[in-house]
Regions:
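Short, compact, well-ordered microdomains
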Residues: 63-98
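N-terminal domain-onset segments
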Residues: 1-65, 75
Length: 98
């Protein structure tokens, strides 16, 4: 995993559009994605927007709640890790796993 100490800048606008189109009933999701502007860490198939150290442990920033799925014509299936308080912890690009 490549940890970006300074928070590599990220443009989530394409994700906001997908969320508005595919999950309009989740009115909080576009704004939750819009604040994902710095990458904490990344692998070839995953972008972390929140520090994943000690997930779901007391004091950890990463407290998992659910997964949401978006489909992108170029990137394929995207799995969003949604944390407590409607935060997006990261995105897994399933097409990059194979």
């Amino acid at each position: 995993m490549n940890v970006n100490e300074d928070g590599k800048v990220y443009d989530p606008s394409w994700l906001v559009l997908l969320a508005n189109e595919q999950l309009p009933e989740l009115d909080w999701l576009p704004e939750a994605l819009n604040v994902c502007r710095h990458i904490h860490a990344e692998t070839s198939a995953y972008i972390y927007f929140v520090d994943p150290t000690n997930p779901n442990e007391p004091g950890s920033d990463w407290s998992f709640q659910e997964n949401l799925i978006l489909e992108d014509p170029q990137e394929g299936t995207l799995v969003l890790d949604i944390l407590t308080n409607h935060r997006v912890g990261g995105i897994e690009f399933l097409s990059r796993l194979f």
